[in-house]
Amino acid sequence: MTRIDVIDNHGQFTHLEQRALRDMGVDVSLRDNTTPPEEIDADGIVLSGGPDMDDIGNCPEYLDLDVPVLGICLGMQLIADELGGRVGGGEYGGYADVTVDILDDDDPLLGSLYPETRVWASHADEVKEVPPGFERTATSDVCGVEAMSNTDEAIYGVQWHPEVAHTEEGEEVFENFLSVCDQQSVARQ
């Protein structure tokens, strides 16, 4: 069975990320972002959202664990920041029901949602420039980089919240991430 660790960056929806995966039958644990990297033993990691880029604990070190990573909201921003992208304030802050245009129908995480999906967004900051090796895989009228992927490293990010009921195809995002984790697990054996 696929094992996923959800890393708690103290976001308002983190418990919903854990619950969504648990309800899908996944062996999932919620781990504080101060957990030492050597204690992480999972087939994949979800970096949760959170309120503060200055309170990301050991998240940068988790990016080196050679397992697939899905960053959600702040989780995506910290991936971009740590790996050479650029994060800044968004022009539109707050909560919103947003139509997101999926740019790559072959993307392992979001391709199945092509050409667009409705999502729930809740953020003030956003990725302004993706890191080297990443592709922008989704955009919207309110955020230029709604998602990004580095398929070679199996590191993905979405600016919105797939764990929230208002996101129409959120469970599919998690299902696609689980598929990536399963494929990577087989490849490592």
UniProtKB/Swiss-Prot annotation:
Pathway: Purine metabolism; GMP biosynthesis; GMP from XMP (L-Gln route): step 1/1. Keywords: ATP-binding, Glutamine amidotransferase, GMP biosynthesis, Ligase, Nucleotide-binding, Purine biosynthesis. One of its GO terms (molecular function) is ATP binding. Residues 3-187 form the Glutamine amidotransferase type-1 domain. It catalyses: XMP + L-glutamine + ATP + H2O = GMP + L-glutamate + AMP + diphosphate + 2 H(+). It is an enzyme of class 6 (ligase). InterPro entries: Class_I_gatase-like, GATASE, GMP_synth_GATase, GMP_synthase_A. The keyword Hydrolase does not apply. The active site is at 73 (nucleophile), 161, 163. Its EC number is 6.3.5.2. Gene3D superfamilies: 3.40.50.880. Catalyzes the synthesis of GMP from XMP. This is GMP synthase [glutamine-hydrolyzing] subunit A. It comes from Haloarcula marismortui (strain ATCC 43049 / DSM 3752 / JCM 8966 / VKM B-1809) (Halobacterium marismortui).
